[in-house]
Design a protein with these regions (language model features):
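Alpha-helical context
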Residues: 4, 8-11, 15, 55, ...
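Phosphate-binding loop that captures ATP/GTP phosphates
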Residues: 78-127
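Extreme N-terminal, non-catalytic leader segments
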Residues: 2-57
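Helical mechanochemical/support elements of P-loop NTPase systems and associated helical scaffolds
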Residues: 24-31, 35, 68-71, 75, ...
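Histidine- and aromatic-rich ligand-binding microenvironments
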Residues: 7-16, 20-23, 59-60, 65-66, ...
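Walker A (P-loop) phosphate-binding motif
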Residues: 37, 41-89
């Protein structure tokens, strides 16, 4: 079943933490807009047909505290602010998942519960 659950992120709160927002003009918005343009060009531009899974972006690093969550959230927010784009942000850090905490949402079942077989329906872990 397709559970059309809508979650809202308090943009005022995350803007105070330095995240991208559609409220006002800020340097962080401009910086991620530049990154977003390149990502969207790869995903949907002329090169998209020559690349496998061109619309998938992975933010990763072997080291903690390098800004992976910050970057992933900001890039997702920046793309989501586009009128014709949707974003699925997956926190695949199995040891220290932090996206929900960072955007101040309570923990809910997620990727690990699905992979461990505790949840059968993938739509139940998309929030």
């Amino acid at each position: 079943p397709n559970n059309q659950k809508k979650k809202f992120i308090a943009l005022n709160n995350i803007q105070k933490e330095g995240f991208v927002s559609n409220i006002g003009r800020h340097t962080i918005n401009e910086e991620y807009r530049a990154i977003k343009r390149k990502v969207l060009s790869n995903a949907f531009g002329p090169l998209a047909k020559t690349l496998n899974n061109a619309n998938i972006v992975m933010v990763t690093s072997p080291n903690p505290n390098e800004g992976k969550t910050f970057t992933a959230i900001n890039l997702a927010l920046s793309i989501a602010l586009e009128q014709d784009k949707t974003v699925l942000l997956v926190d695949a850090d199995v040891l220290r998942p932090s996206v929900m905490k960072t955007i101040d949402h309570p923990f809910e079942n997620g990727l690990m519960e699905y992979l461990l077989g505790e949840i059968d329906d993938l739509s139940e872990v998309i929030h």
